[in-house]
UniProtKB/Swiss-Prot annotation:
Name used for this protein in its record: Aspartic proteinase nepenthesin-2
Activity as a function of temperature: Optimum temperature is 45 degrees Celsius. Thermostable up to 50 degrees Celsius. Retains 44% of the original activity after incubation for 30 days at 50 degrees Celsius.
One GO BP annotation of this record: proteolysis
Span of domain Peptidase A1: 96-431
UniProt xrefs under PANTHER family: OS04G0448300 PROTEIN, OS07G0603500 PROTEIN-RELATED
PROSITE patterns attached to this UniProt entry: ASP_PROTEASE (PS00141), PEPTIDASE_A1 (PS51767)
Gene: nep2
InterPro entries given in the database record: Aspartic_peptidase_A1 (IPR001461), Aspartic_peptidase_AS (IPR001969), Pepsin-like_plant (IPR034161), PEPTIDASE_A1 (IPR033121), Peptidase_aspartic_dom_sf (IPR021109), Plant_Aspart_Prot_A1 (IPR051708), TAXi_C (IPR032799), TAXi_N (IPR032861)
Lineage start: Eukaryota, Viridiplantae, Streptophyta, Embryophyta, Tracheophyta
Pfam families linked: TAXi_C, TAXi_N
Coiled coil: none
GO molecular function list: aspartic-type endopeptidase activity
Enzyme nomenclature, EC number: 3.4.23.12
Length: 438
């Protein structure tokens, strides 16, 4: 899929409910940025986009890597052109779906959960062009709580690109893989399992081209901008816990009071906001060690520059961790030197540092990789370091980014870890755990 579905990814308990509007013709009373919703506590299951498909574990891995590679390139393209394009371009693809329902009575659909996008959108009837989705396309005429957004509304003004037609706020989003969604902005009641939240601003997509590669019917933006779900709910924190690829257990997303705190001493990193790229969550990486050896990569390698280049983004929808070429080369060389296995070529899978496992089944001593954040050291587990694209082959789950120097902390390095975004205190914390455990 594509990225506002840009490009991506809740078991649920909301502690506060709000009464939905009863008129389908009224504009509705919107909560603008100065107003606070009651702090909800939301917990929702997530599933990997290829879940339920008849694919081998190796096929799952290869598909995820290809999506992540496209997404990384799209993020780079967006950052390169962030200074003056009329129609924004967002990252394509995503990895985790969440089930939601929309309207009164409600209509269920799955959407990509994406920390690299702000807009919430789904396909709407009548469609000029819509892609195939596994659930019925939402028809606003069937809902009593639906209301279009006028052009003067704050949420319309928050769009990076909008037009006005008969006081109807229209949007156009383009994705790095060539996909586009066009439609109009509205508000509607969204239901997460059994709890409903009214007046959520979203895009009603009537012309959606190039999507349909996953199971989703839209996108739930979890980025830092005012149109995202965390911003609209007014929550100060959210967290997710993603299970490893191939796990039968669901991943989870929690918002507000349901996003539990972290144990004292857990590794953390400062969140940095970029005025040039306000959607993304930038984190502060200072160095990397392999097998206990500090590689001497300058911290400036991962710093966000004044012109919007560089920096490290934490992203739910990118599969591998991507580093600037010199940093990646240093990690790959140190890892290769220490693992002491013969190398193999798996470049066709999008992986550059791969090894042949011992034919006798003997145990491989995997060098530990540690990410040195400004708030502590995150020691990656073996499942966060290695990935297997083929029988008897293991690969370093990292890659090199483009000449732009952007770094992305991908979802393999975040799996089996509770990742907490504290938006009030500007920090991300990491708690290694078994995400699928009840």
């Amino acid at each position: 899929m594509a990225s506002p579905l840009y490009s991506v990814v809740l078991g649920l308990a909301i502690v506060s409910a709000i009464v939905a509007p009863t008129s389908s013709t009224s504009r509705g009373t919107l909560l603008h940025h100065g107003q606070k919703r009651p702090q909800p506590g939301l917990r929702v299951d997530l599933e990997q986009v290829d879940s339920g498909k008849n694919l081998t574990k190796y096929e799952l891995i290869k598909r995820a890597i290809k999506r992540g590679e496209r997404r990384m390139r799209s993020i780079n393209a967006m950052l390169q052109s962030s200074s003056g394009i009329e129609t924004p371009v967002y990252a394509g693809d995503g990895e985790y779906l969440m089930n939601v329902a929309i309207g009164t009575p409600d209509s269920s659909f799955s959407a990509i959960m994406d920390t690299g996008s702000d807009l919430i959108w789904t396909q709407c009837e009548p469609c000029t062009q819509c892609f195939s989705q596994p659930t019925p396309i939402f028809n606003p005429q069937d809902s009593s709580s639906f209301s279009t957004l006028p052009c003067e509304s704050q949420y319309c003004q928050d769009l990076p690109s909008e037009t006005c037609n008969n006081n109807e706020c229209q949007y156009t989003y383009g994705y790095g893989d060539g996909s586009t969604t066009q439609g109009y902005m509205a508000t509607e009641t969204f239901t997460f399992e059994t709890s409903s939240v009214p007046n959520i601003a979203f895009g009603c997509g009537e012309d959606n081209q190039g999507f349909g590669q996953g199971n989703g019917a839209g996108l739930i933006g979890m980025g830092w901008g005012p149109l995202s779900l965390p911003s609209q709910l007014g929550v100060g924190q959210f967290s997710y816990c993603m299970t490893s690829y191939g796990s039968s257990s669901p991943s989870t997303l929690a918002l507000g009071s349901a996003a539990s705190g972290v144990p004292e001493g857990s590794p953390s990193t400062t969140l940095i906001h970029s005025s040039l790229n306000p959607t993304y969550y930038y984190i502060t990486l200072q160095g990397i060690t392999v097998g206990g050896d500090n590689l001497g990569i300058p911290s400036s390698t991962f710093q966000l520059q004044d012109d919007g280049t560089g920096g490290m983004i934490i992203d739910s929808g990118t599969t591998l961790t991507y580093l600037p070429q010199d940093a990646y080369n240093a990690v790959a060389q140190a890892f290769t030197d220490q693992i002491n296995l013969p190398t193999v070529d798996e470049s066709s899978s999008g992986l550059s540092t791969c090894f042949q496992q011992p034919s006798d089944g003997s145990t491989v001593q995997v060098p530990e990789i540690s990410m040195q954040f400004d708030g502590g050291v995150l020691n990656l587990g073996e499942q966060n370091i290695l990935i297997s694209p083929a029988e008897g082959v293991i690969c370093l789950a990292m890659g090199s980014s483009s000449q732009l120097g952007i770094s992305i902390f991908g979802n393999i390095q975040q799996q089996e870890t509770q990742v907490l975004y504290d938006l009030q205190n500007l920090a991300v914390s990491f708690v290694p755990t078994q995400c699928g455990a009840s």
